[in-house]
Amino acid sequence: MDIREILKVLPHRYPFLLVDRVLEADERRFKALKNVTFNEPHFQGHFPGHPVMPGVLILEAMAQAAVGALVRQPGFPQGGLAFLAGVEGARFRRPVYPGDTLILEGELLAFRRGVGKVAVRALVEGEERASATLTFVLQGAS
């Protein structure tokens, strides 16, 4: 999925759109890319002189990437939304810096009755920087 296709399935927009490209996605697995740049507004205050991507934004990028698999589920309504409902076992192993290419990859663990659970990892140059299990609730289009 390129950015045009991503904009069709994610409601997020600047400065909160945190996925630049979905590299691979099927009903079970996904892999997406986020180019981390110093031009992003959070780097002005997190932290001056030592910019580090906030962990909560790494989690948000992971959640946005997971939608690549969720929208392919038979029960996902066209125009529907996936809301983050839970975060389990979040771990932040190393910082993410401006200039890094963040690879967000994961696997759908379960999907039933409009609720999905996904295991996600965030990597830079093959090294895991963060991981979590995320739960989503799907809401149909109105």
Swiss-Prot record:
InterPro entries: FabA_FabZ, FabZ, HotDog_dom_sf. It comes from the Bacteria. It is an enzyme of class 4 (lyase). The keyword Amino-acid biosynthesis does not apply. CDD domains: FabZ. It is found in: Cytoplasm. Its EC number is 4.2.1.59. The active site is at H46. Keywords: Cytoplasm, Lipid A biosynthesis, Lipid biosynthesis, Lipid metabolism, Lyase. It catalyses: a (3R)-hydroxyacyl-[ACP] = a (2E)-enoyl-[ACP] + H2O. It holds the Pfam family FabA. One of its GO terms (cellular component) is cytoplasm. One of its GO terms (biological process) is lipid A biosynthetic process. GO terms for molecular function: (3R)-hydroxyacyl-[acyl-carrier-protein] dehydratase activity. Involved in unsaturated fatty acids biosynthesis. Catalyzes the dehydration of short chain beta-hydroxyacyl-ACPs and long chain saturated and unsaturated beta-hydroxyacyl-ACPs. Belongs to the thioester dehydratase family. FabZ subfamily. PANTHER family: 3-HYDROXYACYL-[ACYL-CARRIER-PROTEIN] DEHYDRATASE. This is 3-hydroxyacyl-[acyl-carrier-protein] dehydratase FabZ.
